[in-house]
UniProtKB/Swiss-Prot annotation:
Keyword terms of this UniProt record: Disulfide bond, Glycoprotein, Host endosome, Host Golgi apparatus, Host membrane, Host nucleus, Membrane, Transmembrane, Transmembrane helix, Viral envelope protein, Virion
Cellular component, GO annotation: host cell endosome membrane; host cell Golgi apparatus; host cell nuclear inner membrane; membrane; viral envelope; virion membrane
Intravirion domain ranges by topology: 1-14, 105-130, 176-207, 263-264, 325-393
Topology relative to the membrane: Multi-pass membrane protein
TM region positions: 15-35, 84-104, 131-151, 155-175, 208-228, 242-262, 265-285, 304-324
Name under which the protein is recorded: Envelope glycoprotein M
Subunit structure: Interacts (via N-terminus) with gN (via N-terminus). The gM-gN heterodimer forms the gCII complex.
Function summary: Envelope glycoprotein important for virion assembly and egress. Plays a role in the correct incorporation of gH-gL into virion membrane. Directs the glycoprotein N (gN) to the host trans-Golgi network.
InterPro entries for this protein: Herpes_glycop_M (IPR000785)
Gene from which this protein is expressed: gM
Transmembrane helix as UniProt keyword: yes
Coiled coil ranges: none
Length: 393
């Protein structure tokens, strides 16, 4: 039978293997997106051109061949699809590099500070829990499958694969933001490099990962519309309504989750709501062009057009309000703690006020802007705690 130390060594090596596997999957996804964008690489079609609004969808046996007028389902513009998929792949690769950096730093610091094996495992889970790494690899592989299916114009299968990908992506974001351990505070205090990775870098990665979920909410809603359009004999405007409803519900759920749950771990979280705002704008642009081109095929859809615009406008206003609310609450939380983050914010505000006074009243020298002010005098100079609680097992 293996002892506790052998079991901990096996767990540590298994975690390293997961990190390497996730990094390989993320790198493969990025390379697939690059190669799929090059005509000479042998892909039959460009994957991002899902809905061709310039030609009719007259596929033999397709659902729209049984209609007097034919039209493709609502989807994002080609540059938008490319940007959203590229952003998601970049986020997954960034998370993989973050995990690799965490493994390197943790291995070095564990030898230098003689951490106990259990502390090393706790710290590894704080950087990236094993379940998080597995979900990240599944996100990369499923999105790669989506790209290959879209390149071969298998719209229904691609839509089903993307829905699966979004489920993994949402779980990946939730696990990364919340899952960890609170038993490594002594190790983080003793090792500033480990603290920079497991706390500060983790907060940045949390922002972009949840931002990718916000963009994916729009894509998964439209993919559901494509799946419905290719599977059932239903009206075009119903698929557009279904896509809008799914996107709205998922976007609202994400913003509520960020504000209620994730804000307990990291306060500065503007990226998820900002990405929802970007996704709403992209959805609105695609819907406007779609309704304008296929108004005749859609029939009496004036109410649908107005309703779509109204819902997207309200969702955009909510996302904008959530950005402001999150930043204000973050400043209040850091001010109450007396952290360096709020000291820097206060210093920037003081500098801007002095600059405006100088320009408006025409007095003072530029050196006055560099004079020490109250912005950083009354706050603690110690490291701020970005993650107030490091999560739960």
């Amino acid at each position: 039978m293996c002892g506790p130390r052998n079991a901990e060594a096996v767990s540590w090596r298994s975690w390293l293997i997961e990190v390497c596997g996730f990094a390989l999957a993320a790198l493969t996804l990025v390379l697939t997106l690059i190669f799929a964008s090059l005509p000479e690489m042998g892909f039959p079609c460009f994957y991002a051109t899902v809905a061709d609004y310039d030609t009719l969808n007259d596929t033999s046996g397709g659902v729209w061949t049984r209609q007097p007028l034919v039209a493709p389902a609502l989807f994002l513009e080609t540059p938008t699809v490319t940007s959203f998929f590229g952003f998601t792949a970049t986020v997954l690769l960034a998370h993989a590099l973050y995990a690799v950096a965490g493994a390197v730093v943790l291995r070095r610091e564990a030898g230098r500070l003689a951490f106990q094996p259990s502390v090393v495992l706790y710290a590894a889970s704080t950087v990236a829990a094993p379940g998080t790494l597995m979900l990240g690899a599944l996100c990369a592989w499923t999105l790669q499958a989506v790209v290959l299916l879209m390149a071969h114009k298998q719209a229904g299968l691609a839509a089903a694969a993307y829905i699966t990908h979004f489920v993994f992506l949402a779980l990946f974001g939730a696990c990364h933001a919340c899952k960890g351990t609170g038993d490594v505070r002594a190790a983080l205090a003793a090792s500033p490099p480990l603290r920079r990775v497991a706390v500060h870098a983790r907060a940045v990665v949390t922002n972009v990962v949840l931002g990718a979920v916000g963009l994916g909410a729009a894509v998964v809603g439209l993919m559901l519309g494509v799946l419905l359009a290719n599977s059932f004999h239903i009206s075009l405007w119903k698929t557009a309504e279904a896509a809008l409803a799914v996107f709205t519900l998922l976007a609202l759920a994400l913003m509520v989750f960020v504000e209620v749950v994730v804000s307990g771990y990291v306060q500065v979280l503007p990226t998820p709501a900002f990405c929802v705002l970007v996704a709403s704008a992209a959805f609105g642009v695609s819907a406007h062009r779609y309704f304008a081109k296929f108004s005749e095929a859609l029939g009496e859809t004036h109410g649908v057009v107005i309703g779509t615009r109204a819902v997207l406008a309200v969702l955009s206003l909510i996302a904008l309000a959530m950005i402001v609310v999150r930043l204000v609450r973050a400043c209040i939380a850091h001010r109450a703690r007396g952290s360096r983050f709020y000291a820097n914010v206060d210093k920037a505000r003081t500098t801007a006020r002095r600059y405006l006074q100088k320009r408006l009243h025409g007095r003072g020298n530029d050196e006055y802007l560099l004079a020490p002010g109250s912005g950083d005098d009354e706050f603690d100079d110690g490291d701020e705690v970005v993650y107030e609680n490091l999560g739960f097992e």
